[in-house]
Amino acid sequence: MVMTDPIADMLTRIRNANQMSHAKVLIPASKLKLEILSVLKTEGFIKNFYLPQSSRDIIVSLKYAPNKEKVIKGLKRVSKPGLRVYATAQQIPKVLNGLGVALVSTSKGILTDSQARISQVGGEILAYVW
């Protein structure tokens, strides 16, 4: 089966597993997905992720608060294959007035909205996470 938007598929898998309070979720591997997951881990939205040697799937450990409250409240794909969304460093929006992050694909790799503003680089706005 051909997937037209693998990033949206990854976000949907994380969203669905999060809603059902699963501890882990499997995601088909790619370099871009690994980079996005690295940013999500750095920002504290997921616990961990790893790619086993014998597998093509990334295993993502989701993060929950001590009272079983979900850390990820929402995920939204912004730039889609049919409608790409680009922004300069000054045009990158804040997500929930800074409570969430925008994932931006730049020439320096995948950055959060605040990192992109500090680095003065724009790019494609991939998703919002809050």
Curated annotation (Swiss-Prot):
Keywords from the UniProt entry: Ribonucleoprotein, Ribosomal protein, RNA-binding, rRNA-binding
Family to which the UniProt record says this protein belongs: Belongs to the universal ribosomal protein uS8 family.
Pfam family, one: Ribosomal_S8
GO terms under biological process: translation
Complex formation: Part of the 30S ribosomal subunit. Contacts proteins S5 and S12.
Record carries keyword Nucleus: no
Any GO MF annotation of the entry: structural constituent of ribosome
CC terms in the record's Gene Ontology section: ribonucleoprotein complex; ribosome
Keyword flag rRNA-binding: yes
Source species taxonomy: Bacteria, Bacillati, Mycoplasmatota, Mollicutes, Acholeplasmatales
Protein name (database record): Small ribosomal subunit protein uS8
Provenance organism: Phytoplasma australiense
The protein's role, per its UniProt record: One of the primary rRNA binding proteins, it binds directly to 16S rRNA central domain where it helps coordinate assembly of the platform of the 30S subunit.
